[in-house]
A protein has these predicted regions:
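Acidic, polar-rich low-complexity tracts and alpha-helical solenoid repeat scaffolds
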Residues: 4, 24-372
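Bacterial N-terminal signal peptides
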Residues: 13-23
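Bacterial N-terminal signal peptides that target proteins for export
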Residues: 2-14
Length: 372
């Protein structure tokens, strides 16, 4: 019998983790205070793994695992397949069960267990079929475990294989670039993504290559410039001239990021187009937050400070309006193509927030008139 082999559309880091540009440290369990050991006398027992499955043979375990997986009961599927792998090493289903156990653990988010199973099947150098698919999934598990260098090594090997299709090589190279981003190697990642797009542009018949991964490469070029944009802080204490230089540089990075996101939208992939629209609106919203929270430079006199605030409010209103326009166009496009993903919901929430800010700004303009 064959393994389950779902499509290998498991893109590393559709990665909403990049929304903050920060990674989270893993929590470690605290060791409990040691207590004096109590001695309990018990009859000797024999460890049999999962006693409830002990009566099932390998055929029954494999069939039950397939049924559980089809019913989306991935924890049960993992139990059946793991039992077969651990207790029936001579089964004709051993290889398929090993791969399927990895799939079930992956679905459960148990990436350490998924990695241990996929590693037994994966062959990134020469594998085909499940061995090739397992290599991609092995890298995926390593990514989720934060072992970026190990994932990059596998994906580099896959991306260099001449026997793979152009789409498979592009997938490996894009996922390598995402791992480089997460590993903080932005320059290396930028070079990787640019090579992907150059290779895609040189493809004789791009219609035969799924645009998902090239669009992801373009999107992550935007992400790299967005991360660089976020790294530039605006400190009014350094003086008006230096603040103006930093603001100009920050605006240049914003426009560079926006340029890559706009190229994604022109590529037409509906997932990454929606994501890019959300990101563009977010850039303007972010710059708005920077400006509105930035204090007036200390060197300005009171009259100069008042003029500064007035000019700042004009710029802020422009940014809010731009964000609203981008968010609205993004939602219109998403509705037109039927896109449904986390970026769509976040766009709706951001649009509502920006509209509320614009209304609040208009009410400030009305206050003097009301007073009169």
């Amino acid at each position: 019998m064959k393994s389950l082999s779902p499509p290998r559309r498991q893109p590393i880091a559709i990665a909403l983790a990049l929304a903050t540009g920060a990674s989270c440290s893993a929590l470690r369990a605290q060791r409990m205070e040691e207590q004096p050991a109590a001695q309990i006398q018990m009859e000797p027992i024999v460890i049999t793994g999962d006693p409830q499955l002990e009566r099932l043979n390998d055929e029954e375990l494999f069939s039950a695992g397939e049924s559980a997986f089809a019913a989306h009961d991935y924890r049960a599927a993992a139990r059946y397949f793991d039992r077969l792998v651990d207790f029936h090493p001579d089964s004709k289903h051993l290889r398929s069960a090993t791969y399927n156990a990895g799939l079930a653990h992956e679905k459960n988010g148990d990436f350490e267990d998924a990695l241990s199973r996929f590693s037994l099947v994966a062959d990134p150098a020469r594998g085909t079929g499940d061995a090739l698919d397992a290599a991609f999934r092995q890298a995926e598990a390593l990514y989720h475990l934060g072992r970026y260098a190990d994932a990059i090594a596998i994906l580099t090997e896959l991306g260099a294989r001449a026997d793979l299709t152009e789409g498979e090589r592009l997938q490996a190279q894009v996922q390598r670039g995402v791992c480089e981003v997460e590993d903080g190697r932005l320059e290396a990642a930028e070079a990787t993504f640019r090579r992907v797009l150059t290779a895609y542009q040189a493809t004789d018949d791009r219609g035969l290559v799924d645009d998902f991964y090239p669009a992801q490469a373009q999107f992550f070029l935007g992400e790299i410039y967005r991360l660089r944009y976020q790294m530039v802080s605006l400190d009014p204490n350094q003086g008006v001239d230096e603040l103006a230089k930093d603001l100009e540089y920050k605006a240049e990075l914003l426009l560079s990021a926006q340029g890559h996101y706009l190229r994604v939208i022109r590529m037409g992939n509906r997932y990454w187009s929606t994501a890019s629209g959300e990101r563009i609106g977010g850039l303007y919203e972010s710059l708005y937050q920077h400006l509105v929270s930035s204090p007036v430079p200390k060197e300005l006199e009171e009259e100069e400070a008042q003029i500064y605030r007035q000019e700042l409010r004009k710029k802020i209103r422009v940014l809010i309006t731009k964000a609203i326009n981008v968010y609205e166009r993004t939602l219109e496009a998403a509705e037109r193509v039927g896109a449904a993903n986390p970026f769509v919901e976040r766009t709706r929430e951001s649009l509502q927030k920006m509209k509320e800010l614009l209304i609040a700004d208009a009410q400030i303009d009305d206050e003097p008139q009301t007073a009169n």
